[in-house]
């Protein structure tokens, strides 16, 4: 009787467009498609290293609720557009770049003055529109990081040393934009109970979908290697106690779920501002929310399921220190 587990012998990559690909792996033993697909998907969404703007200083602006003469966008929309610029650094962890432009016209990511070891992946990305006499002078700090880090939980040392006019951004470092997977039936000779894993991956262009899969697999192998070399400790009591790590996706605002306006407003009315707040609520609790019906509940459940989450989950140490409400 065969006791060894099958390993994939066919790995195919099909391009679906720029920075978008479908990766097919088969055959897997029954059940391993979901086991590995879900693990890879969660690592791809939460643990990939990338680059993002983390701080912005705009000449003539003290805070994000300001406006600039001659600039069509207000500062909030300007910051959102800056967050959409995809940077890539070479052999360094942070850099400060400058965006200066004046006169009527469109300001794009290609107008940013870059250092030799920094590049912009999407130079045609629109940042702002200037009218006659308009002027824009922006300093942008770009850092290397992992996952998603809200600005309100980041630490910058002495609070009194903050620079007036410096705006701290929520940073989405992940170069992976979307990931989904499906498990289909596979066949090897007479066996028809095998799995075929199909992964659909879209990246920002900092890395290719194929490289994203490789990196996520290496992360999983590195983490699981600890269990392969498992050894008992002298006393469990001597092990240092650590606070449970919180999945970065739980720190994202519920607005990132892109719910309908009705559903989003109902959640905020119940002081549900973060995904971590939402998943701790049960279906019955949400149905008691005014104006939130079964249709909105099903929408919320589907959006959470697409991210590997469900309602009624339990979280320790929530909310984390420094999380604004």
Curated annotation (Swiss-Prot):
Q: Where is this region: Alpha N-terminal domain (alpha-NTD)?
A: 1-231
GO biological process: one example: DNA-templated transcription
What the entry lists under Pfam families is as follows: RNA_pol_A_bac (PF01000), RNA_pol_A_CTD (PF03118), RNA_pol_L (PF01193)
Q: Does the keyword Iron-sulfur apply?
A: no
Question: What span is annotated as the signal peptide, if there is one?
Answer: none
The UniProt entry, under InterPro entries, shows: DNA-dir_RNA_pol_insert (IPR011262), DNA-dir_RNA_pol_RpoA/D/Rpb3 (IPR011263), DNA-dir_RpoA (IPR011773), RBP11-like (IPR036603), RNAP_asu_C (IPR011260), RNApol_insert_sf (IPR036643)
* Alpha C-terminal domain (alpha-CTD) as annotated region, ranges: 246-325
List the molecular function annotations (GO) for this entry.
DNA binding; DNA-directed RNA polymerase activity; protein dimerization activity
Keyword Nucleotidyltransferase listed? The answer is yes
Please provide one cellular component term from the Gene Ontology annotations of this protein: cytoplasm
Task: Quote the catalytic activity from the record.
Answer: RNA(n) + a ribonucleoside 5'-triphosphate = RNA(n+1) + diphosphate
EC number(s) per entry: 2.7.7.6
Instruction: Give the UniProt keywords, A-Z.
Output: DNA-directed RNA polymerase, Nucleotidyltransferase, Transcription, Transferase
**SMART domains the record matches:** RPOLD
User: Do you know which SUPFAM superfamilies this protein is assigned to?
Assistant: C-terminal domain of RNA polymerase alpha subunit, Insert subdomain of RNA polymerase alpha subunit, RBP11-like subunits of RNA polymerase
Q: How does it assemble?
A: Homodimer. The RNAP catalytic core consists of 2 alpha, 1 beta, 1 beta' and 1 omega subunit. When a sigma factor is associated with the core the holoenzyme is formed, which can initiate transcription.
Q: Member of which family?
A: Belongs to the RNA polymerase alpha chain family.
Function text: DNA-dependent RNA polymerase catalyzes the transcription of DNA into RNA using the four ribonucleoside triphosphates as substrates.
Q: How are the domains described in the entry?
A: The N-terminal domain is essential for RNAP assembly and basal transcription, whereas the C-terminal domain is involved in interaction with transcriptional regulators and with upstream promoter elements.
- Name this polypeptide is given: DNA-directed RNA polymerase subunit alpha
Native organism? Burkholderia thailandensis (strain ATCC 700388 / DSM 13276 / CCUG 48851 / CIP 106301 / E264)
What gene is behind this protein?
rpoA
